[in-house]
Amino acid sequence: MPCQKNQKLSPTVPSREMSPLPDFWLPVFWKNQFRTTIELPTREKYPQVEGGTAIMTGSNTGLGFEASKQLLSLGLSHLIMGVRSIEKGNAAAEKLRKIAPSARIDVWQLDMQSYDSIQAFAKRCDTELSRIDFVILNAGLSPSSFELVPDTGHEVGIQVNHISTALLTILLIPILKTKTSGHRPPRLTTVNSLTAHLCKFPNKDERPLLASFDDPKITPWSSQERYGVSKLLNQLFVVKLCEIVSPDDVIINMVDPGLTKGTNLGGHHELGGVAGALAGAFFAICGRPVDRGAASYTNAVYGHGKESHGCFLMSCEIAPLAGWFYTHGDVLVDQVWNETLEELDFAGAKDIVSNI
């Protein structure tokens, strides 16, 4: 289903079978940000939302909050907000309840820097929910400085944007299979980014790969680079996962909401000085309004069917994966997959995947 004005549906080709995006990415960026208008979702376009149950992580601010507003306006009956701060989540939920007073809105703790929190969240989904129609894994961050997560020893961007997101994905898939409403497969959409295509990935040959991000002497720190490569790792992981999970059971895809103003993800609010001012101006000039970026979430969930399984969606269309998949995917996909499953072995990730 198109979400651009006057957009025509083109023949469906899976992301992995497309030609890669050009290395010179400015024309793609220009088209996305200045030549494409994402239409806001309506009940007529997305009747599937009405009466459903959804999980949205990172839903108290930015794109997650705006997407929650839109979904509730479409008639969503039950929203589970996965948030790190219960206090901030409750404040956001109160605003949402004014928009949809008849909907049930629950605020559940989810700290993506804590394996215990992620496992507890997944367990609640299993024990407390009788139905889950779709999940949007929106929680993510773009740290402005190097930081390790004390409990895991991993750099925080790689931890949250890839490793923890992979864990939650793996834990939720068998749960989703048992919580389907029966007439359509549940959906799981992870938020990804065009920056996965743009990263330089200088440590791609380091082994072990994931651990190489934890030492700036091995992999020099760059905020923009690290955000992009964290999304690349998760993209490669999802591609492999979708070879194992059938779209008849769960439809899994990835969505890029585009550069969006009105969120804190870019980290420019923390920079200060001239750098912060320039970054803020860039977002203000080039960024999509937050409601347009959020509209791409609904389109990813219900604007596409099984043909989007394992695909990367950009401006509401199935788009190529990051260039690294086409040039180094034969090695990197398996490397990322194996190292991630090894990292998550404590949670039984290998057994879960083998029994999906």
Residue ranges, per PLM feature:
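Short, contiguous pre-domain boundary segments
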Residues: 37, 319-324
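Non-transmembrane alpha-helical segments in soluble domains
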Residues: 173, 238-242, 298-301, 337, ...
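Short glycine/threonine-rich loop-to-helix capping motif typified by GTGT followed
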Residues: 264-267, 323-327
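C-terminal helical subdomain
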Residues: 279-320, 330-332, 346
